[in-house]
């Protein structure tokens, strides 16, 4: 029974970490999300090692199934938010590249006092 309680507690820790990661992704705190991800991955690895030998009780399996379902839902939402961020960063890189090309083009004309995007 103590092993089962320990396993349940490990899954709860993973769920708590995934909820924290989801919150960080929701508020776009990407640096903290990356930092927390290492802790999350270690917890998943440790729990996987425990789970292999411990999961025999049907009641425990159902409790773990519920936690896993929530963890997976959080993972899906985190990935969606990360993809949205990646798309936004790609758009910004594209805009920056286009702006640099325009500035280089207009910078070739010596009579141009200002480059596009500059103010007097």
UniProtKB/Swiss-Prot annotation:
<dbReference type="GO" id="GO:1902209">
    <property type="term" value="P:negative regulation of bacterial-type flagellum assembly"/>
</dbReference>
<feature type="region of interest" description="FliD binding">
    <location>
        <begin position="60"/>
        <end position="98"/>
    </location>
</feature>
<protein>
    <recommendedName>
        <fullName>Flagellar protein FliT</fullName>
    </recommendedName>
</protein>
<comment type="similarity">
    <text>Belongs to the FliT family.</text>
</comment>
<dbReference type="GO" id="GO:0044781">
    <property type="term" value="P:bacterial-type flagellum organization"/>
</dbReference>
<keyword id="KW-0963">Cytoplasm</keyword>
<comment type="function">
    <text>Dual-function protein that regulates the transcription of class 2 flagellar operons and that also acts as an export chaperone for the filament-capping protein FliD. As a transcriptional regulator, acts as an anti-FlhDC factor; it directly binds FlhC, thus inhibiting the binding of the FlhC/FlhD complex to class 2 promoters, resulting in decreased expression of class 2 flagellar operons. As a chaperone, effects FliD transition to the membrane by preventing its premature polymerization, and by directing it to the export apparatus.</text>
</comment>
<keyword id="KW-0678">Repressor</keyword>
<dbReference type="GO" id="GO:0005829">
    <property type="term" value="C:cytosol"/>
</dbReference>
<dbReference type="InterPro" id="IPR008622">
    <property type="entry name" value="FliT"/>
</dbReference>
<keyword id="KW-0143">Chaperone</keyword>
<keyword id="KW-0805">Transcription regulation</keyword>
<feature type="region of interest" description="Required for homodimerization">
    <location>
        <begin position="1"/>
        <end position="50"/>
    </location>
</feature>
<comment type="subunit">
    <text>Homodimer. Interacts with FliD and FlhC.</text>
</comment>
<dbReference type="GO" id="GO:0006457">
    <property type="term" value="P:protein folding"/>
</dbReference>
<dbReference type="Pfam" id="PF05400">
    <property type="entry name" value="FliT"/>
</dbReference>
<keyword id="KW-0804">Transcription</keyword>
<keyword id="KW-1005">Bacterial flagellum biogenesis</keyword>
């Amino acid at each position: 029974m103590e092993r089962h309680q320990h396993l349940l507690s490990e899954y709860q820790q993973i769920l708590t970490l995934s909820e924290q990661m989801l919150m960080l992704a929701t508020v776009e705190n990407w640096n903290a999300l990356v930092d927390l991800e290492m802790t999350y991955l270690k917890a998943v690895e440790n729990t996987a090692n425990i789970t292999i030998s411990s999961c025999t009780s049907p009641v425990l399996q159902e409790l773990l199934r519920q936690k896993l379902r929530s963890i997976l839902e959080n993972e899906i939402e985190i990935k969606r938010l990360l993809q949205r961020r990646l798309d936004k960063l790609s758009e910004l890189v594209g805009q920056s590249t286009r702006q640099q090309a325009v500035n280089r083009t207009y910078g070739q004309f010596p009579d141009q006092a200002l480059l596009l995007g500059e103010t007097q």
